[in-house]
Regions:
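Extracytoplasmic small-molecule ligand-binding "clamshell" domains
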Residues: 24-92
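A conserved helix-loop-strand patch within extracytoplasmic ligand-binding domains
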Residues: 65, 69, 93-95, 105-156
Length: 247
């Protein structure tokens, strides 16, 4: 009888442990690199704000999640996810086959493209290829950097933060910057110190979807976030967020 009770207790314990291990979380820590305006950035009070922040907060509200955002440098953001320091990453992360091989993604919550920014004094360049023999900047590890490296004859120069690339272009150290459309618009069209110096040329030359990244195999969290994403889109909350930050 004692053996039976012991075995029964063990079964109950293991079952409880299994349920706990795979239950959808009630709170999550989320990493973001707040140097990518207007998607994620720091405001005057050093608070993390932006499109992605508002979007995930809306998703969290729809699913009953509590979210704690952590400002994390891009070059270490995925390592933190690997080690369990964060439960998810939302930082304008393009869904690619290479990234999907290592991580799980939610459904795409918005779409963007890469675009080229050059000085207004450049009257001829319309594409990256037009800058052969010159340096073109981008943020390290981004799809923008990947696009620059595809073009023969162009020298790729990468930066830890995209703002540093625009600083270098303002001083003539590089001849162009490639980044996501909303970021390009922020620096070239809205930023006081740059809007008279830079211009966006051509059209977006990629079509990319942003997804929220989680550790491989965490289906419960992906499903929970996808449920929230669908609810946010159904209520057109994403349109309001887009209008607030991008338009």
């Amino acid at each position: 009888m004692n053996v039976f009770r012991t075995l029964t207790s063990l079964v109950v314990v293991f079952a409880a442990m299994s349920l706990t291990a795979f239950a959808a979380p009630k709170s999550i820590k989320v990493a973001t690199d707040a140097t990518w305006p207007p998607m994620e950035m720091l405001d005057a009070k050093k608070q993390i704000v932006g499109y992605d922040i508002d979007f995930l907060n809306a998703v969290a509200k729809e699913t009953g999640l509590a979210v704690e955002f952590k400002n994390t440098a891009w070059d270490g953001i995925f390592a933190g996810l690997d080690t369990g320091k964060y439960d998810a990453v939302i930082s304008s992360v393009t869904i690619t086959d290479e990234r999907k091989a290592k991580y799980d993604f939610t459904d795409a919550y918005t779409s963007i493209g890469q675009i080229l920014v050059v000085p207004k004094t450049d009257k001829t360049s319309k594409t990256i290829a037009d800058l052969k023999g010159k340096k073109v900047g981008s943020q390290i590890g981004t799809t923008g950097a990947m696009e620059v490296k595809k073009v023969a004859g162009v020298e790729s120069k990468t930066y830890d933060e995209i703002g540093l690339a625009f600083e270098d272009m303002a001083t003539g150290r590089i001849s162009g910057v490639v980044c996501d459309e909303p970021v390009a618009a922020h620096f070239a069209l809205k930023k006081k110190e740059y809007k008279e110096k830079f211009k966006i040329v051509g059209k977006a030359f990629t079509k990319e979807g942003y997804g929220i990244v989680v550790k491989k195999g965490n289906k419960e969290l992906v499903d929970q976030l996808n449920k929230g994403i669908k609810a946010v889109k159904a209520k057109k909350l994403d349109t309001r967020i887009h209008t607030k930050w991008v338009k």
